[in-house]
């Protein structure tokens, strides 16, 4: 049997996914804490969702360094979602930055998003971001979005910055060999620049962005120029590495119509035979 070659896009997606699950369960998740004001008690949760503070700090550094991509976004935020990207159910989770000897509670808003403060103490202690949800139930995503956009609009500069932040966090949590593997496959250390869209040989090197609901269409617009984007379910694919599109270019999506309500049950057909009373068809 002939094996298909492993596509670079698949490898990058796989490695970033693995990186999100590589954060070690350290002492911060197992230590018992004193009952002090402001303490967030989440130690009873077995195998909680965790991410290293140093990886988050790498994302904060990249956000600051690349802020020109999305200058109107005031700060990097993080969003807690269901494992498959769906909205959370039930109560909002509790979160903290914690190490053996301290804990910094984090405040989540109604959309379960939050910001992470810079803390030299957290860096020095190799602290972790910990949620009181099991890691297989939720995930933490970066959130970069210019205020004032319509619900069906996305700005490509925001998506470019979000990609760079995600990659910075992923690299910080990957082993050295994995970073080198992806660098070699993409032939660049700037992974986000690799996603330039369709290739001359018919391939697709596009970055996938998830919307809020199932999509019907997605169109990239920049002045008089436009491009129909591929959609699949709730996601659309965007050539963020194609610099011919300005950072202010917008993606406008149309959502798929809601599924039709279930049709009423159909009554069985009635047939007649000569000299017989009506009977239902078989």
What are these regions (language model features)?
Residues 1-8:
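N-terminal secretory signal peptides that target proteins for export/translocation
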Residues 10-23:
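Bacterial N-terminal signal peptides
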Residues 29-117:
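N-terminal Sec/ER secretory leader and immediately downstream segment
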Residues 86-87, 103, 133-143, 227-228, ...:
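Short, surface-exposed beta-strand/loop "edge" segments at domain boundaries and coil↔beta transitions
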Residues 102, 109-120, 125, 221-239:
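Glycine-centered loop-to-beta-strand initiation motif
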Residues 114-135, 241-252:
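Noncatalytic modules at the cell exterior or secretory-pathway interfaces
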Residues 123-189:
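Surface-exposed beta-loop interaction hotspot
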Residues 167-282:
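A eukaryote-biased signal for long
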């Amino acid at each position: 049997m002939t094996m298909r070659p492993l596509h670079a896009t698949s490898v990058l997606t796989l490695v970033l996914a693995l990186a999100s699950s590589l954060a070690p369960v350290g002492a911060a998740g197992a230590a018992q804490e004193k009952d002090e004001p402001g303490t967030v008690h989440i130690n009873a949760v077995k195998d909680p969702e965790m991410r290293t503070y140093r990886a988050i700090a790498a994302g904060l550094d990249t956000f600051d360094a690349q802020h020109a991509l999305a200058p109107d976004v005031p700060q990097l935020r993080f969003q807690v979602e269901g494992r498959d990207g769906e909205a959370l159910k039930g109560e909002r989770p509790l979160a903290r930055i914690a190490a053996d000897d301290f804990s910094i509670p984090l405040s989540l808003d109604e959309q379960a998003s939050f910001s992470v403060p810079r803390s030299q103490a957290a860096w020095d202690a190799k602290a972790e971001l910990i949620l009181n949800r099991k890691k297989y139930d939720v995930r933490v995503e970066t959130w970069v979005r210019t205020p004032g956009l319509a619900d069906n609009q996305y700005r490509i500069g925001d998506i470019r910055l979000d990609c760079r932040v995600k990659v910075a966090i992923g690299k910080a949590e990957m082993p050295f060999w994995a970073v080198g593997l992806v660098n070699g496959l993409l032939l660049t250390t700037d992974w986000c620049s690799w996603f330039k869209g369709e290739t001359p040989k018919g391939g697709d090197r596009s970055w996938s962005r998830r919307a809020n609901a199932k999509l019907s269409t997605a169109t990239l617009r920049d002045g008089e120029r436009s491009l129909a984007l591929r959609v699949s379910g709730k996601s659309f694919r965007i050539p963020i590495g194609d610099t011919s599109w300005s950072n202010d270019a917008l993606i406008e999506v149309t959502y798929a119509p809601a599924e039709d309500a279930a049709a009423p049950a159909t009554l069985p057909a009635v047939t007649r035979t000569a000299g017989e009373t009506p009977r239902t068809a078989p």
